[in-house]
Structure formats: C-alpha cells, structure tokens
C-alpha cells in the first residue's frame, strides 16, 4: 500500500501517491517489518538507504539531507549513508540508542534476474557487537537481571565469550555490580519491566539501552540466575543469527573480593571523573594491548583479599621494575599484538576476515620473540604450526573481503596455481593481440582496451578508419575513434570470465579451509591472550611505578605510609607528600576548607586499593593491612531528581558503612553531618565516630566539628592540615601534622573566595562576638558548678540545673532547654 499520516504500520510506508509500492520499496517494507524494533539499513548500490519515517529518523539523528525516492505512482522520504563510511555512522547510531538491521545485496546486480536479492546479514545492538571497528577497547557487556530467590545478575561479552553471573541479596548490591561492570545493554525480566517505579529509577541511574528477551531458565544454580542466563543466550543468539561462541558460565561471589560500593568507586574516581578527565584507571593504563586494558579494569573492579596471590602479582611487577631492558622489550612487542581474545571469537563464529588472519599471523610472529625475552616459563602455547600455515598461504597485505580476490599466495594451492596460469595465458593472448593486429592491419595507433560494458575491444583512431578489416565488428563510436571486436576475442573473453569465477571460488575454498585450521586453535589463542594480557598489566604497572616513583607495599596489621601521594592529583600539580600511621584507630582530620583534607583521605584509600590489585604505590614506604572493604562518604552527591537531598544521600551512604564495615575495613568520612543544623550535625557525627571506634575500623574522619577532637575515646587520634595566616592572607601548606587544628579559618577562606570586603569584616565581627559570648558562658558554667552543693539537690532540681548549664554553654536563653 501507499502512504499514510500516522504511526509506522506493518506493510505500509510513509509517502505520497496512489501506489502500489514499486518492487524495491516492497522488498524494503517486507524486511523492515521482520525487525520492527530495528532501524533497517538497506543496501542500494554503494549506499545503505532508509525510506519513509525511518529515513526521517536517520536524517534527524545524523544531520543528513532528506531527499525523496520517486517512482511512477509513489514518492517517499529517503536518506542514506555511504557503505565506505558505515562503521563511523553505525557507531554514532548505536551510541544514540538505535538497534540496527543491515540488509545487504547477496547477489551481484549483473547476475540478478529482476530485483537484486537482499537479506539482513547483521543485527547490531550496543551489547552484542563482535565487529572490531564498532567495539570499545573495554569489555562490552550485555547484562540480564531477574528476580526469584534473590537478584539474579548475569553478564555476557559476545565479543570475547566471557559469561558470568552472581546472585545478590539486595537492590543496592545489584546497583553496585552494575556500576562496577557498566554494561552497554541490559535485559530486564518481565516482572521488572512491568514495575514502572523500578524502571524509572533504573533508567535514571543507568542510562543504557533496555531490551527484551525470553527469560527461560538455563544452566544450573538458583532460579533467578538461571533465568538471567537463559535471557542472555536467547538474545545473543537472536542477534547473531544463531551462531554464538560462549565460554562456560562462571559463578562469581562479590564477597570474595574487596568490597567497593558504588559510592567508593565514584568518590575515588576509579573509572569516572567527578570533574575534569582524570581517573585512577587513566593514570594506571599504560597497557599495550586491548586484553591487557580489559584485565586491568577487571583487577580494579575486584581487588584481592588474599596475601598469596597479591605477593605473586607484586613479584612479577617487581621483576619488570628491576629489569628495565626486559620491560621495554616486552612492551615494544606487545604493542604489535592484535586483540587475540576477540579474534578467537570471530574465528569460532566464522566471521574472521582475510585481514583478521593477517593480523593473527603478525601476532603469532611475536610469540617466539617474547619467549626469547622471558624464557619458556612464560607458558605460551605452541602455535608455530598455524603460523607456518598462515605464512605460506596469505599474501602480505590481503584485502578486507574474500570476494575482492588476490589473498592466497602463489605456490600454496596447486589447483589455484593452475587456474591462475590458465588465466595469465588468456590475458597474454590480448597483450599479444595488439602487436599482431598492428602488424597485420598496418594501423600504428591500434590499441587493445577493456571496459566493464563492452569487455575487451580494439580501438582505431579516425585517420585509419579506411584500414579497418571487414571482420572487425563495431561496438562503440566516439568523437575521434571507434572500438571493435572480433569473434575470437569474445570466445577468449568468455573463457577469461569463467577462469576468474573459478579462481574466486577456489580462493574462497582455500580461505575457508585456512580459517577452519585457525578456528581449531581458538582455545590456544585465548590462552595466549590471557597470558599476554597478564604480562601487559605487570609491565604497565611497572612502567607507572618507575616513571612516577612508586614503591612496593608490604602487608601487615598496621597502616603505615611514609611520604604518600595522591596518584591522580600529583599528575596535575605539585604535590606535598604526607605520612600516616594507624592501627584500628579513629583518626580525626581537621583544618580549613581547601587545605587538602579530602585529598589526604582519598590518597590513603587509593594507596590501599592499588596495593590490593598487586600494584606498587605512590609513597616512599607503605605497610598496609589487607582490607576487606573500602567505604567512603566524601563530597556532596545529592539526588534532587529522585527527591533526595544531600543530607539524605549522605545518611544512606553512612548507613551502608555502619551495616557492612568490619574491623578489617577502611572507612573514609568527609564532613558528615554538614547537611543539617549544627546541633544535629555534631550529634550525628559524634554518634558515628563512637560507633566506628567501637567497631575498630580503620577510620579517617575529616570534620569541621571541633567538638569531636575532645571525645574521650582511647583509640582516637587527631591530625590537622597545616595552614597559617600571613601578611598576604591564608597560606595552605598541605601538610598533615599531629593534633587538632587551632581554628577553621572559615572567614579567611571566604575572603579568598572573593566575598565583598564589607561582608568579610561583618563576619569577623560577628565571629569575635560569638566567641566572646561563648567564653563568658563557659566561665559562668564553671562558676555555677563550683558553687553547687550536689548533696542538697533533689532529682528534679538536678535535671533543671543541667538544662540551664547546657543553655548557657550554647548561648541560649535560660529555660529554653526545658520540657
């Protein structure tokens, strides 16, 4: 049918005219309707085209000029992208949230009987990509979430075959794992999709594509997890045309690693910056391979709890630190490696291109050199047989597609060589023909040429027309020349075409056999990729350590850091190192704003995190406990869209700390309680400090509440960040020193921030008056206490007296604390 004015409907296409649709558009609509959730990119010659309302969507998304496809009885909007630029446009569309169905011409136009046959050859969604040009270097996870006996969460990276999952007890734990893995696409079980409140909250926290799939249980384990596994496999098979390369499912337990809640990952800027562009991962990422980069991210997601594996990692990093020439040699070779992990997947899916096999050959050529540097103990599999096969078979620089031809070396396949010789003889006939015909006809300008329309021809210029033999058959007349053919030329030409088709077919057969030979080594390639990724991370961490002066940490019961630094901040500006020593203590850190309290807290946590992935740390010396969790409450992170204030978010994060932190946890608290009144804030901060002290956590608590520094807690230690008023104003020394700060310097910081002079002076006057009143009130409290005879007070009088003392201490009118 023809056009319509409403929503896209099956069998219809937006446009104008009585119809019916021409055959090309009928074919387009039929394919489009098979994939209603996808944007169909429909090959027409050298372009992928969209028609109707999809053309309008494509034009809006990419800023393309909208044209029209016009036939006798119908006109429809049209927009397209050139096939040569497909990867760039597809990447943009996927990031915008489009699912793409790619319909290619599956037969040559010249061989088609009528309309060229087209089929959907690719379904592209953000979480199911295998195409190297479209994939990020990071892991590209598709996630599925189901409920039942807990929250079942499973991940699948279609590009590598990684398949894993976990069963979680709470929604907050679910969100932590999702934030840690950052999937590109998420499948929600029906009971979650139908929960509007959950979907709204989920979309706000995780702005990724949400998709649907059948959640039929598959595999073993708890029902919720089996449902999530089944959904991933069903969706991945649907987008991959049934072909899938997946490793055995791995059940993992987040509790087997250091606990890093979402708030900690955010506050410490492990993967995403709070401002600017710098992150811990960015500082550490000196990797040379894509699998190495993904492995480093995995280590940061899941720091280790056990000393043995950590010491083993540190030993390997230290070797590369000590042996600079070895480190440089290994890194130089690793830089030349292809992404063997993803290449192995494309081999198993039978999607590896000639250039993939060439990249595999170059990578395998590096393995003997690496073994020469590191010795056989490196454990790389023997792939020399495959390397020799690839060397013998592939030309140096093969084309992207098999259909382009010219990818198999001469001498590799006898049948192909025989066909090529026959073809060369056929070409030689035409080369010799020019000389023979020049001599026979006496036409010195005669030439043999070729074009796609007429094939081979003889060309004669105007001055020699009278010498053209009668047997020459004209095929084309130009301004000053004519073109001819001979019966024997057509016979020879047909034979050449036949040989070219046979050569192309044989090359494809040889290539497929070669790819199958490589596919059989896919597991060995994955093992090589795993070993090389570990080498890459060890060498990268060593490079960072040498370049920036890191040291190997030791593990013990105390936390002792000498000249510690913040690994990210020190890259941007001159940095003042600081010491810290504590053991199951509550350390209060006071000092003015901007002095560096938050940086000091963060650097301590980052040093601990680095140590527990097996990295050297930014310090002159470091001894650390093995922490079971790193918990933070740092910075304002209100959730206004969700109806939560800064204070509410702060209290939720503090509640998580109190729920989970143990005596083996590192806890960082920055200005807890500032989002409410000062009285409430002091009370909450005091109660929190007492609770964490009782729990024996390793706690660093930065605060402006000087009341906390006087708490009578046996394991409380006071530190302050040094600052001093000098003639030019307040000077920050960024040094952390023993004892509490003498004052908060709030007015001085306000002056530095540019508050008007009259406002600053008024603030100083008010501060002096308040301090005087407080001092006078305290003196009066002391006098009244000294004059008191407790033996003569009734219980009611004693209670009233305490209320009066508290009112005096707080500067309130007497009687205001009663009742």
Curated annotation (Swiss-Prot):
Keyword Nucleotide-binding: yes
Top-level taxon: Bacteria
Temperature dependence: Optimum temperature is 80 degrees Celsius for ATPase activity.
Region feature A1, mapped onto this chain: 2-130
Region (C): 571-819
Residues involved in ATP binding: 591-598
Gene Ontology biological process terms in this record: mismatch repair
UniProt entry keywords in alphabetical sequence: ATP-binding, DNA damage, DNA repair, DNA-binding, Nucleotide-binding
UniProt cross-references to PROSITE patterns, sorted A to Z: DNA_MISMATCH_REPAIR_2 (PS00486)
Statement: the UniProt record of this protein carries the keyword DNA damage: yes
Gene Ontology terms, MF aspect: ATP binding; ATP-dependent DNA damage sensor activity; damaged DNA binding; mismatched DNA binding
Residue ranges of the region described as B: 275-570
Pfam families named in the record: MutS_I, MutS_II, MutS_III, MutS_IV, MutS_V
Region of interest called A2, as start-end residue ranges on this chain: 131-274
Matches recorded under SMART domains: MUTSac (SM00534), MUTSd (SM00533)
Role, per record: This protein is involved in the repair of mismatches in DNA. It is possible that it carries out the mismatch recognition step. Binds double-stranded DNA.
Family membership noted in the UniProt record: Belongs to the DNA mismatch repair MutS family.
Record note on quaternary structure: Homotetramer.
Protein name: DNA mismatch repair protein MutS
Gene that encodes it: mutS
